[in-house]
Design a protein with these regions (language model features):
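A conserved beta-turn-beta hairpin within the catalytic core of GNAT-like acetyltransferases
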Residues: 68-77, 86, 212-222, 274-278
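Amide-forming acyltransferase catalytic core, primarily the GNAT-like/NAT-type
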Residues: 132-216
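Conserved beta-strand in the GNAT
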Residues: 54, 60-68, 75-80, 198, ...
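Active-site rim helix/loop that mediates acceptor-substrate recognition in acyltransferases
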Residues: 17-21, 28-57, 61-66, 174-196
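Conserved GNAT acetyl-CoA-binding A-motif
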Residues: 102-113, 246-256
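Conserved catalytic-core motifs of GNAT/GCN5-like acyltransferases
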Residues: 111-114, 131-144, 273-285
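Conserved acetyl-CoA-binding loop-helix of GNAT-fold acetyltransferases
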Residues: 81, 87-100, 123-127, 229-242
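Conserved active-site alpha-helix within GNAT-family acetyltransferase domains
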Residues: 92, 116-134, 258-276
């Protein structure tokens, strides 16, 4: 803790991109698979709903945090500290300053997710007053060995995510309720790599999925017209399977709330298995500030 006195937390600037990307790359297993281009897009997006802070220690950026705000709630997308600066209280500083900033903006509840294997991070957040809100399964399947079915009556359109509109449909992961709007804004303005598929029946939108594709096809979010729209989910899975095969992707990854039992069951029937899980945590700032 001796070095914390020389540390300052400030709003991130575009010139911090290289430092943030370096820290992110070293923390990818803990945080996820976002690209350099995505981080750059986040920093370039001028929105009052995005809060990005960095911590400087002796003039060098050693940590950062990104959060999305939606009305009186916020979702912490990431907090990361450079390996060389860990154990000095920087993570606590970043979280504390972020919570203060969000509280000033009218945020009452803050949410975040922690990978189930990351016990150190889980204990860190529990120690800061966060509690368990839910669990998300990360389910994966090999497209070459998936069950294939023909789902009649549905049409599938593949587009760039930047062309997506806002639809009145329900995400299959809880955090998407908070991040979907700002993600779409980033896609439209700066980030062109993300793809989307729209599933329709009788000219009505039944499902929307955003994803990125490389060695693996990684789904960011699947939204359905209702949680009973099983056929629409099946048509979506078939479309993802076809895209993965055409792209040479070896796996498809889909996140889904563990509480959505019917959806989990269906995805398993197509050959998917739970490869990982994430804890959703929440803290009520109205009782702390």
């Amino acid at each position: 803790m001796d070095n914390v006195e020389q540390a300052i937390v400030r709003i991130a600037r575009s010139s911090d991109l290289c430092s943030i990307s370096r820290i992110y790359a070293r923390s990818m297993r803990e945080l996820g698979k976002e690209s350099f281009e995505w981080l750059r897009a986040v920093l370039r997006t001028r929105s009052k709903r995005i809060v990005t802070l960095v911590c400087e220690l002796n003039g060098e950026v050693t940590g950062f945090t990104i959060a999305y705000k939606k009305r009186n709630a916020a979702y912490i997308e990431s907090i990361a500290v450079d390996e060389s600066a860990r154990g000095k209280g920087i993570g606590s500083m970043l979280l504390s300053e972020l919570e203060k900033t969000l509280a000033k903006k009218g945020v009452e509840k803050v949410y975040l997710s922690v990978k189930s294997w990351n016990i150190a991070a889980l204990n860190f957040y529990l120690g800061k007053g966060y509690g368990l809100k839910g669990v998300v399964f990360i389910m994966t399947g090999d497209p070459d060995y998936m069950t294939t079915r023909y789902i009649p009556g549905y049409t599938v359109m593949e587009i760039a995510a930047s062309r997506l509109k806002k639809y009145r449909i329900r995400p299959t992961t809880w955090w998407s309720n908070l991040v979907e709007d700002i993600d779409l804004s980033i896609y439209k303005k700066f980030y062109k790599e993300e793809r989307a598929i729209i599933v329709k029946k009788d000219n009505r939108v039944k499902a929307v999925t955003t994803y990125s594709v490389n060695d693996e096809l990684v789904v960011d979010n699947i939204s359905l017209s209702s949680y009973n729209a099983i056929e629409a989910l099946e048509a979506t899975i078939m479309a993802l399977r076809n895209i993965a095969v055409a792209s040479g992707s070896r796996l498809i990854e889909i996140p889904v709330d563990a509480s959505k039992r019917q959806l989990v069951k269906l995805i398993k029937e197509y050959g998917f298995k739970v490869r990982d899980s994430e804890y959703l945590l929440m803290k009520d700032l109205s009782t702390n500030h």
